[in-house]
């Protein structure tokens, strides 16, 4: 069995009772350290509150077959910062498990994607589909990011811009801003009147 457990945005403080029960009764517990960054001491606090070992799971572990192989025979839980199914990575893991006949249980929780807009006073129905902003280089500078932002903008919608992670660290705010400005310039759609707000590891652009 595979439990995908969203633990929310406040570390152990946002664990639900059902999630805590699943955490305590699992044979193996992993903490996703690839798709999002939690509080610095989140792993230690989870271990203490559950009184058990919790294994950090990086990209290679999550995208490999190792977690699914365990889940074929044991009760396995994957702890996810935020909500359990916001990231494509976790949805793909769920589908792969189901294809193998593994029972999957999802534990929902709050994520930056579904709380950022309200946090800064925007209405949810005025927020369009999110877009990911990757680290760029001289050989990789995807302007499709701005295409998606512009599509939302032309529809009167704000855009959540999800900032990429690298080596366990968020892209600095200033770097993200400069990349967005350069992308707009290259696409010929530069508009300095647009506003970006930093919120919960995310931008809401509009």
From Swiss-Prot:
Pathways per UniProt: Protein modification; peptidyl-diphthamide biosynthesis
Subunit structure: Homodimer.
EC number(s) on file: 2.1.1.98
Organism: Thermoplasma volcanium (strain ATCC 51530 / DSM 4299 / JCM 9571 / NBRC 15438 / GSS1)
Family membership: Belongs to the diphthine synthase family.
Matching Pfam families: TP_methylase (PF00590)
Enzyme class, first EC level, given as a word: transferase
Binding site for S-adenosyl-L-methionine: 9, 83, 86, 111-112, 163
CDD domains registered for this protein in UniProt: DHP5_DphB
Name of encoding gene: dphB
GO biological process: methylation; protein histidyl modification to diphthamide
SS bonds (residue pairs): none
Organism superkingdom: Archaea
UniProt name for this protein: Diphthine synthase
